[in-house]
Amino acid sequence: MFVDEAKIRVKAGNGGNGIVAFRREKFVPRGGPWGGDGGRGGDVIMESSERHNTLVHFRFNPEYKAERGRHGEGANKTGREGVDVLLKVPVGTLVYDDETGELLHEFVHPDERIIIARGGRGGRGNAQFATPTHQAPRESEDGKIGDEKFLRLELKLLADVGLVGYPNAGKSTLISRISSARPKIADYPFTTLQPNLGVVVVGEMPHEQSYVVADIPGLIEGASLGAGLGMQFLRHVERTRLIAHLVDVSDASGRPDPVQDYKVITKELASFGSGIEKKPTIIVATKIDVANPDKLKKLTTFAKRSKKAFFAISAVTGEGIEPLKWEMAKRVEAIRAKAQDPVEEADEIEAPKKKRRAPARKSVR
């Protein structure tokens, strides 16, 4: 389980002011009060979305403000309501009041929608103050102040892609090339002592795609029985949507057969007993800048016979990196589209169903 966090400030719109106005038209003597009410301020709304999987956007854009309501007008016209702001968050996001630490909401299911900061009520115009004994009121109300909150968002991330393979297969180097993650990298086994997380972005706005990659610490023969760094890391693989199985085809590994390397790790995944080995898999030959040609050819042939997607890359030179990034993006998107329930694990307390409001007119993704 990985944790992403962001702190934001949200400000709902203030209500518009009511106004003082009187009806002055020909042939309408003593027209009376005609001042309209102010419009309601816009709300700040949060909605859970399957198409979002990190909080990275909120870290770079920490402030959100809804539009204030317009002031009332003559002819007893109510001011226009302020435009709501819609913030889309990943399923699994927890929303805390950053000042009190109170948990305000947990988004457990897709398409949950809550008002996190409510807009201020519009003030009353003088027409609202008219009575039989007070027929020309000159008082009105200002709009109410909209809610302002400082929030802490926390997301327990489930990786879309798990990078697996023997220690030193190049997983940490790859994740450092395709994302902003900076894991410890050195030329010895078990450099990675805990899963590293990276967010990969492909394409450009407004059509960019993102997915989460986990650099799972190196597995070895017997991992399913606790060997090496043990079963704890197999649990992380279990939660991914797609596996990228990295196989070193250089002579640096000291192992003669890359196909056997692939089979050993696949056997460990199968021995874990939760169907991990059945997940969609891409075979990735690594270190092709210093590849043993015979090893590369053998692994390529095996991948074709196994009808597995196959890519050959060098994280050092960058060869093959871009096609691999796009292939993973395409496959993750297809898996997400097919998923019936993207939340594999929910806490014991389910969020109550919320009443739907009319869709907000301004969306922040």
UniProtKB/Swiss-Prot annotation:
Its EC number is 3.6.5.-. Its main location: cytoplasm. Residues 353-365 have a biased composition (Basic residues). Pfam families: GTP1_OBG, MMR_HSR1. Residues 159-333 form the OBG-type G domain. GO terms for cellular component: cytoplasm. The keyword Electron transport does not apply. PROSITE patterns: G_OBG, GTP1_OBG, OBG. GTP binds at residues 165-172, 190-194, 215-218, 286-289, 314-316. Residues 340-365 are annotated as: Disordered. Residues 1-158 form the Obg domain. Keywords: Cytoplasm, GTP-binding, Hydrolase, Magnesium, Metal-binding, Nucleotide-binding. Gene3D superfamilies: GTP1/OBG domain, P-loop containing nucleotide triphosphate hydrolases. It is found in: Cytoplasm. InterPro entries: G_OBG, GTP-bd, GTP-bd_Obg/CgtA, GTP1-OBG_CS, GTP1_OBG_dom, GTP1_OBG_dom_sf, OBG_GTPase, P-loop_NTPase. Mg(2+) binds at residues 172, 192. One of its GO terms (molecular function) is GTPase activity. Belongs to the TRAFAC class OBG-HflX-like GTPase superfamily. OBG GTPase family. Monomer. An essential GTPase which binds GTP, GDP and possibly (p)ppGpp with moderate affinity, with high nucleotide exchange rates and a fairly low GTP hydrolysis rate. Plays a role in control of the cell cycle, stress response, ribosome biogenesis and in those bacteria that undergo differentiation, in morphogenesis control. PANTHER family: DEVELOPMENTALLY REGULATED GTP-BINDING PROTEIN-RELATED, MITOCHONDRIAL RIBOSOME-ASSOCIATED GTPASE 2. This is GTPase Obg. It comes from Koribacter versatilis (strain Ellin345). The lineage of its organism: Bacteria, Pseudomonadati, Acidobacteriota, Terriglobia, Terriglobales.
